[in-house]
Amino acid sequence: MVEFFKTIDGRITEINEFSEGCWVNMVHPSSDELAQIAKAAEVEEEFVRAALDPEESSRVDTEDEQLLMIVDIPMVEKSSVEDGGQLFSTIPMGIVVAKSAVITVCLEDSIILRSIAEGAVKGVHTALRTRFVFQILLRI
């Protein structure tokens, strides 16, 4: 699944296609989707593919004018009805900062990114790439 978002009139809004200053949220993307987004954003396909390895460790990598950050994010593995507790695990999430966009890639839909996409986080400006990345990281 690939979704495109952009800040329009101070609100995060879903758009239909890639554009300058947008946020691309990819959840369990296909090979074709990875290739299309890598081409549109002019980033290395390996950067957008890196977070799809469940064993990928956290790291930061740079290549030309692009930055890849892999961070582990918590996911609820299962809930225990008996004691009301939850079991958590982590999965990698990739954040690619390109010249014209921020791309997030994850194997599963994350409440962290979903809350941003649904407008629960105030002051989000997708065109301000560094600030937007910090807003994502602060939600983790």
Task: Show the residue positions of the predicted features.
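Peripheral, non-transmembrane regulatory/ligand-interaction domains of membrane transport proteins
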Residues: M1-I140
